[in-house]
Amino acid sequence: MGIGVLIIGDSGTGKSTSLRNFERGEIGILNVAGKPLPFRNDLARLDNARYNQIHQALMKDSLNAYVIDDAGYLLSFDNFRRAKENGYGKFVDMAQSFEQMLEAIAGTSADTIVYVMMHAERDADGRIKPKLIGKMLDEKLCVEGLFSIVLIARNIDGRYVFETQTDGLTPAKSPIGMFAEREIDNDLKAVDTAIREYWNLKPLGGESDG
């Protein structure tokens, strides 16, 4: 069973930039919006990835690290594509497609980590949560509750960090002792190393057993 890591943050908080220290062959980038990465790199990526392509990549499971950047756009693009449809059924379908993607993540090998990046939004009480479309996903399926690790991307006075434990207004969480501090540098490769060391997973870049 693969490990999903949810990364939530506003635009400009360094979510994509956190990939900067990965080397080619270490991670598969499923680039939903097709945007260029914000740093020089030769990382292999699949631009304009949609659900079927994401499922195919995860089923192949040829790497032991993937990132879906930004998973929220899967919902947005699906909603635009079906804009002329009325009724609750559209949102049921959208919720099912998203949930099936999460199942595909869980279906990868035990040494595979899949990072799911999403934009943030705030509820009426100011609490941060992943930005979703439709009440079914928002109310019936607590997306952040399906992940054992949730990181919040922040820009604090020009310092880009991941929050690893909640401050009371975020769903940030991680296992006890996995990270030395509540706020860490937004280096996703260092995060990957910490997760693998904590749970004794195969090192980054090794072939998956999937």
Question: What spans do the regions from the language model cover?
Answer:
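Conserved nucleotide-binding/hydrolysis micro-motifs of P-loop NTPases
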Residues: 24, 33-37, 71-73, 120-124, ...
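Short, well-ordered beta-strand core segments
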Residues: 27-29, 114, 150-152
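Structured loop/turn residues at beta-strand edges in well-structured enzyme cores
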Residues: 61, 110, 145
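P-loop NTPase motor core
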Residues: 70-142
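Conserved GTP-binding G-domain of TRAFAC-class P-loop NTPases and closely related GTPase folds
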Residues: 123-210
